[in-house]
């Protein structure tokens, strides 16, 4: 096992205009402060305030949005990072691990990774993701890319349809179709940071949000050694070269993860489990007393001084006994949050330290809070109660179905841009309006300037005389539409759908 030296991981260089020379501890910290400013002031972070956490189109400001959730994750991530550093300091291992002058950047990378962890999520959360993928699967039929004979290919796009005698090109077609039909919020986050927003963050900071290490075009089984790390797509074909450079800069083996990403993941797991239940009480899906009974019965066998009694039972008893001028709801969730954090943060920090050789190598093939311990069981308890009593509630399911229809409907509306021939779309991009395509011209004008420029830049660099050109042009055209629609807030997507469908406001 190679030695653990975080100076090889906390890489403060950037893709463009990178700082040069040897830097002092203070200068390195200033570089990461610059990252913080770029992230906090980015439009992608601001848009999180109108994106779904659990309840779409929620008008009650007390219920969490993606932004307030991300801020809570940021705080928990900071807490875990500080706990890890404190324990390593007590063990006199900070210098051994190359962290003695990097404690500030260590904390900052974790905090900002937590704040950014959801920036790629589309409107309406996972149902928005499903709508995008289902729509493009019906359009491109990626499963037919393996069909024999090739005449069974139902793809409606001629440039992506498999052709006899074009095996090399067919491999690219398969890759492109698979990639487009696997939109994923984490992969879109990488695309936002590098390609669309051009934030030019340090390599270490971007490494912190590369949660999954499987490329979106992957076909077939994943290796058992990386099954957890590769359970979802982590980046797209469009960012393949950037990720290859990222791996080199952070000394990451293929399909391995950046060490601090495990902390971000644990902070997210801890935060949303309690928060989803609190929001459900705020929405009157159930009362706090009903919630306690749901948790009690779901835990199963009860023993004195069990983790359930120390965390949930303690919160329930204190909230009932406390005579402070606060509601039982407020007190219960205050105590539940404090008790949960104290137990799970401590456990996550120790798991990080105990498994540091594998984590540093990027090969630890599970989450910090995913094992056979009671702490993992407590987290699963919260998740299971939320699944059974919150996510399955008729009001929540109705809003999710509406969100799915909105995203599917918007893709239907913008489909004419995907139906244009290569030459017609290229002419539309150059002239921005064409009389013979009045609908397509108006749809093109509605696309974000940032997204259009990203498309133009990458396509202009493709060799037009190459056989791959029509395939890759269409790939980036699909990305253009996905970028635009996934970047909408819930409310904007809802309003845009109603406007374009001529539904009365």
From Swiss-Prot:
Q: Which residues form a coiled coil?
A: none
Alphabetized UniProt keyword annotations: Hydrolase, Magnesium
Give any Pfam family that matches. Answer: HD
Q: Does the keyword Hydrolase apply?
A: yes
Q: Which residues form the HD domain?
A: 66-273
The cofactors it requires, by name, are: Mg(2+)
Looking at the keywords, is Calcium present?
Answer: no
- Which proteins does it associate with, and in what oligomeric form? Homotetramer.
Which family is it part of?
Belongs to the dGTPase family. Type 1 subfamily.
Q: By what name is this protein known?
A: Deoxyguanosinetriphosphate triphosphohydrolase
Give the source species.
Salmonella paratyphi A (strain AKU_12601)
Please name the gene that encodes this protein.
dgt
